Swiss-Prot record:
Pfam families: RRF. It is found in: Cytoplasm. GO terms for biological process: translational termination. Responsible for the release of ribosomes from messenger RNA at the termination of protein biosynthesis. May increase the efficiency of translation by recycling ribosomes from one round of translation to another. It comes from the Bacteria. This is Ribosome-recycling factor. GO terms for molecular function: ribosomal large subunit binding. Coiled coil: none annotated. Keywords: Cytoplasm, Protein biosynthesis. Belongs to the RRF family. The keyword Cytoplasm applies. It comes from Finegoldia magna (strain ATCC 29328 / DSM 20472 / WAL 2508) (Peptostreptococcus magnus). Disulfide bonds: none annotated.
Length: 185
């Protein structure tokens, strides 16, 4: 019974860790990432179409994205939409490929992003603690309803706490890795 409770807790906690990792992917770390263009829509034959559906987007260098439209007639439209998106990137068009050079992050911007990363980590820790509280309450109800003994309750509570500590440490490691990535020049 207690193994199932721990398994359920770990399943819920894994969702929190996955959500944290996904949130951290949105924090730009000076490297060019094609996913930054996911929300850009271009007018193509009278229809608003996602950029990735009308062009090949690649990252040939750490701080450069290239966009190669399949139909060269929409190059101006792509440029216009990138400039309108307020990404802080100026596209350069050579007639066949649009290049997006990503500027180096300033020290102040890096520190700002580090604070954002810490906030994401703290939110995840709060979620983990909330999950722990729910499972501790469930365990106490089980003991009150005589489903488990008092000794089993104490063992289960210790296991829940050690799992919580492990998950908190994992969140700290994820946040530290992202901070390190942000601060490297």
């Amino acid at each position: 019974m207690s193994k199932q409770i721990l398994k359920d807790m770990e399943t819920k906690a894994d969702k929190t860790l996955h959500a944290l990792k996904e949130e951290l992917k949105t924090v730009r770390a000076g490297r060019a990432n094609p996913s930054i263009l996911d929300n850009i829509m271009v007018e193509y034959y009278g229809t608003s179409t996602p950029l990735k559906q009308v062009a090949t987007i690649s990252a040939p260098e750490a701080r450069l994205l290239t966009i190669q439209p399949w139909d060269k007639s929409i190059m101006k439209e792509i440029e216009k939409q990138i400039q309108a998106s307020n990404l802080g990137i100026t596209p350069s068009n050579d007639g066949t490929i649009i290049r997006l050079p990503f500027p180096q992050l300033t020290e102040d911007r890096r520190k700002e992003l580090t604070k954002v990363v810490k906030e994401y980590g703290e939110k995840s820790k709060v979620t983990i603690r909330s999950i722990r509280r729910d499972f501790v309450d469930d365990a106490k109800k089980m003991e009150k309803n005589a489903e488990i003994s008092e000794d089993e309750l104490h063992v289960l509570l210790d296991d829940i706490q050690s799992l919580t500590d492990k998950l908190t440490k994992e969140i700290d490691n994820i946040v530290t890795d992202k901070e390190t990535e942000l601060m490297e020049i």
